[in-house]
Amino acid sequence: MNGLDFDGSLFWRADFSKPPHNSYTSYDYIKKAAEQKGYKLKQETNPLLFQTSDAKPANESYNVRVDYGTKNVTNLVEYNYDKKAESYTRSSDGVITTDRETGKPVAMQNIFIVEASHHIIDQDGRRDIDLESGGKGLLFQHGNVIETDWKQVNGRIVPVKDGKWLPFVPGKTWINIVPDLDAASISKGEGV
């Protein structure tokens, strides 16, 4: 659903965030709009793969910094691995990402960074990002980093190694899309 088409009816603006990142909707509104557009509401999909056994955490854990900045704007995103919690925390320009309702840091078990072709399409800097063709990726789990490829399968971006899907660690996954993997710099972490 395109927020430009449905702004004010399907989407509403909240005052606790700055535009344009303050547009929200609900399941009921999306369902209503999908019915109006004649979209299928049910579809068979294969489940994502998840690890079923306890994977061993790395002896040395790795953190990653992703530079989304431009020559005029700084935007550094960092993920730091916490060995005790077995999860990553995220910060943006030094500010820890927290859950708006609980105030607690958002903790993720998988960080997936994918390289996808970006093309600027207008003078405002909007981008057309190729999420169909696949490419190279980096998958962070248990403090480890795995060089992967990625594929788009039925609208989902999945990690692939040697032609096979790689399983995610059960929990939360954060996918970062960058024009070049050089935007990601990996460092050995202390592991809290």
Segments from the language model and where they lie:
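A surface/extracellular/periplasmic glyco- and lipid-processing/surface-interacting theme
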Residues: M1-V192
